[in-house]
């Protein structure tokens, strides 16, 4: 019984010691925040079935909802079962700058369960730079000595020794241990190993993690880190020499099939081509109490899966501008930052939940000198527009009658039916509605008149045939060009003038005293290549085309538009065709007989009058 109590006590004591190596626990939440050059970032790890929500507090304690807002410079990434990230710029809303030059932001954190109930809530004050850690751009943005292009720069998670490579970029990996501050060795003028001396670790403030910033480029790995049993991943390095491989932070063994490969550590490579490569080994993951399958990039909003995954390694090779990588411009340097984190696998039992996974978070940083990038003179040629898709479809057309030849005003619906004298001009316009493509052109095919509102009513009289004035009319229809100066889309209009006429009954040749309606069939044309959308009415081809068909054979495949109303005629006289000779010989004789009868009547009247005059005399 005594041994059992001893074992239980030992486990309870040992567990906090192990967890203390990775994070500081505080009742409520496990969280951490970082101070950057232009802003601060809060990272909160939720418990199972929790979703983290953020609010900010002003100086009076009022709470305000936090959303992705470019005006307040707030950004939030919060998903169930994943770490929640809240980023705020130093010039963002409710960020206060104190007299000591530090920025303060009060954040209210609450964990919400799936049923909507708030499980835990806590206030956190973010202070940047941190009181016990002064962050300056010069502390990690020191430019390299002799820039050389096209060399990837790497850094390992556990640098035992290292030296600075010549190149235009820096890399940094930040491990999250409790306030372990490395003391850099004095700079050396000659290339060689530079080993950071690490003082004895001491615990910091509960509820936050302090950063151990390890700035080095091209870390040489110890031989024990290069003992990779299987599943070697070739290192991305230019050249195949041992020196180039080691400068890239990789292992070299000329006895192997791939002599340059990644070691048992975390390797970061930053490339001037716009990519970074992050490689983590299974041995490193197990050392930190995490599973390699649970490692991912923290800032990726929709997930950014590894480009390669084996039983021994996981590889991320992604563009610098993707996967949630943050970019900052500090002076003449570009800083790209992201984090490699691991999810906690929780096992739920009938009476509680446990986990055997540690908490792992690694801050990665790529730094480039912007002045080292060469300018590019580019000429941008706009691609050819795609060929138009031609197919049948509805068109909105309108036929209207103008009040005069200027086509500046038009009759309204209440003005119909119009009354016109024979041979008086009628000004007709057809236009395309609800189209703004200047390349479209309205094409008239057939225009005709009928005595009713039906376009198929008989009799009919053609006005335009195949887009040209009907040649069988002695009063030829006159086409009127659209005014390009006043019309925004002049090709959407067609205008013509006709002389007023009345339709005759086909059998009696009597004038129809009803009204006349006008119709036109039309389509929209879009020129392709050397083709045009104009109609030529003076060529032999056009005359042949016009005489080869009739409007009744084409109107069913086209859109038909009609006039808003009819044109009527008052007291239309009975007309005879000019070529008719019916009863032409008898009509003069009838007139002579009528004149003779009238003369006889008048003569009789005169004789009677004279007789009465003589009698009185």
Curated annotation (Swiss-Prot):
InterPro entries: P_trefoil_CS (IPR017957), P_trefoil_dom (IPR000519), P_trefoil_dom_sf (IPR044913), Zona_Pellucida_Domain_gp (IPR051148), ZP-C (IPR055355), ZP-C_dom (IPR042235), ZP-N (IPR055356), ZP1/4_Ig-like (IPR054554). The modification Pyrrolidone carboxylic acid is found at residue 21. Expressed in oocytes. The ZP domain is involved in the polymerization of the ZP proteins to form the zona pellucida. Residues 181-196 have a biased composition (Pro residues). It comes from Rattus norvegicus (Rat). GO terms for biological process: binding of sperm to zona pellucida; prevention of polyspermy. Proteolytically cleaved before the transmembrane segment to yield the secreted ectodomain incorporated in the zona pellucida. Belongs to the ZP domain family. ZPB subfamily. Its main location: membrane. This is Zona pellucida sperm-binding protein 1. One of its GO terms (cellular component) is egg coat. The keyword Metal-binding does not apply. Component of the zona pellucida, an extracellular matrix surrounding oocytes which mediates sperm binding, induction of the acrosome reaction and prevents post-fertilization polyspermy. The zona pellucida is composed of 3 to 4 glycoproteins, ZP1, ZP2, ZP3, and ZP4. ZP1 ensures the structural integrity of the zona pellucida. Residues 269-540 form the ZP domain. Disulfide bonds join 226-251, 235-250, 245-260, 447-468. Residues 224-264 form the P-type domain. Residues 1-20 form the signal peptide. Residues 179-198 are annotated as: Disordered.
